[in-house]
Amino acid sequence: MTIPCSRPLFIEPFDLYLFGMGRHRHLYRILGAHPAVQDGEAGYRFAVWAPNARSVHLSGDCNGWRHEGCPLFPVGVSGVWAAFVPGVRRGSLYKFVVRGADGRQEQKADPFALWAEMRPGVASVAWDIDNHAWGDGAWMAERARQGLPLERPVSIYEVHLGSWRRRHGDGHPFLTYDELGDQLIPYATGLGFTHLELLPVAEHPLDQSWGYQTGHYYAPTSRFGSPEGFKRFVDRCHQAGLGVILDWVPAHFPRDAWSLGRFDGTALYEHLDPRLGEHPDWGTYIFNYGRNEVRNFLTANALYWLREFHIDGLRMDAVASMLYLDYSREAGQWLPNRHGGRENLDAVDFLREVNTVIHAEFPGAMTLAEESTAWPGVSRPVYTGGLGFSFKWNMGWMHDTLGYLAEDPIHRAYHHGSLTFSMLYAFSENFVLPLSHDEVVHGKGALLSKMPGDMWQQQANLRLLYAYQWAHPGKKLLFMGGEFGQWNEWDESRELDWCLYRFPAHEGIARLVGDLNRLLRSEPAMHRRDHDWSGFRWVDFADYGSSVISFLRLAAGERPLLWIFNFTPVVRRFYRVPCPRGGTWRELCNTDSAYYGGSDVGNAGAVMAREDHWGGGHFIELTLPPLAAMCFAPVTGQGT
């Protein structure tokens, strides 16, 4: 084998200056591996940041995986090592052999690798970025023109690509990106979802981590194909009218010796002190957000997914663990900030910076925070003191609602506040209402199995839950399998129980989800004022004895929608509900319809509002189906 001879590589001083300042927005085009030609020879240029390393060599299939012979050369005092290596081809596997400041030699994956080999291998793959001709220009232009979808319908289908569907019989369990495009896109659009949210697709070594322990931050996982395969998938989503959100993990990274940890023999990407640099629950390292180069690594990574893969949004995982220095720590296990407080000021600055940069460079791209505390202003602009996210997951709504519905209906009257409490803070943030993967794992059971009663009551409760979620102010998110009433808890090692579609009750649940999405899209009152009190008005929140609530969804100049919910299995006849106008109110939704698997109790499709001579105004008198929600709209007239 001919051993290629590496050569010094020139890097523009301004690029190195921007990197040192933490401000290089195209950093992934400077560091990492990229095709190049030098002195008429084709090869790849390699660059890696390892300021405390004693030496760095390239090892790969281009040189028989020798640990020496292809050295990288220090670029001034920047801490970057770089070289041009002729003869390296697209698809070549490689690692960096780093002799650290501690004298130890480790084989490291490239932090900026554009692709990586299939697990259990962890080598990086020499690849290139500009390898796809995009066809989603109309989508991208319209997204930028419209801006954030605060007043537009957003219904998110959360998906783990490795277990949505699986192949059988050929030894490779995963669908390719192209096969996922053939099957997942028409399925999600057929149900009326506006966006997919994908659990992390950045390369990760352990299937059981679901992608939340990222090994290669810049490499789409090879489980489903190549980076351009993922680009084709996103392109097809956009051309079908479906947005794509990625779960992104800037909170922590795994301790594997080949990864970012102790990269140059020192705590480079993480803090040295375990009270700052190690997560006690997950056994992972925490990024040092106060270091310019680390912050640049993460910020450029966020921009990379948005720019190079046309991603429509990033959902940031475990934001609460970033914000608090004492997160999941006892007294004496954490260090206070410079003011003596528990807030991680460096992480706060990082989150504000990355949100500001994303919204400036990509108008219309969303950032979503999984933040489970009462930190103020998560989805408020940075210039007002907020963190700058577009949306925040409403974990309180999820916890209270699922807790309420887990109660036997006979006890729900004593927990009525759990149902109504969310409206006290519903407009304090731009909320997404999540029924996510976290609620159907680790012994929690599937959503359907959380519901009390016999099989019919469980299914009715689930339909009631979905109607309440869609009617409640806030954007919507549902994890895969929930749309047809998956019985079993989610297992990342097997596909969903698609056989349940053969049962009419489960098919009915899917029909309901599709109709709720169509109602969300077609009725402005269902989405236009999701984050403002002017879009919601209680009709009756106090009938705890019957476990019935009712409210209006409103939009200026549009017809109001009246929602009524009966959280007991009792049919309530001649039930009076105030309404804002007289005339006929047509039924738009009844979750007890036989079409959805219900008992078909209803009001023949419409009710007549009558004048209330005693208290003024108008009311309707109707039959409330058991464990069901109903939605009515006035037949004539506009506005509120």
From Swiss-Prot:
Catalyzed chemical reaction(s): Transfers a segment of a (1->4)-alpha-D-glucan chain to a primary hydroxy group in a similar glucan chain
Database matches in SUPFAM superfamilies: (Trans)glycosidases, E set domains, Glycosyl hydrolase domain
Active site, renumbered: 317, 370
CDD domains in the cross-refs: AmyAc_Glg_BE, E_set_GBE_prok_N
Signal sequence region: none
Pathway as given in its UniProt record: Glycan biosynthesis; glycogen biosynthesis
EC number in record: 2.4.1.18
Biological-process GO terms, alphabetical: glycogen biosynthetic process
Group of enzyme by EC: transferase
Family recorded in the similarity comment: Belongs to the glycosyl hydrolase 13 family. GlgB subfamily.
Protein name per Swiss-Prot or TrEMBL: 1,4-alpha-glucan branching enzyme GlgB
Source organism of this protein record: Nitratidesulfovibrio vulgaris (strain ATCC 29579 / DSM 644 / CCUG 34227 / NCIMB 8303 / VKM B-1760 / Hildenborough) (Desulfovibrio vulgaris)
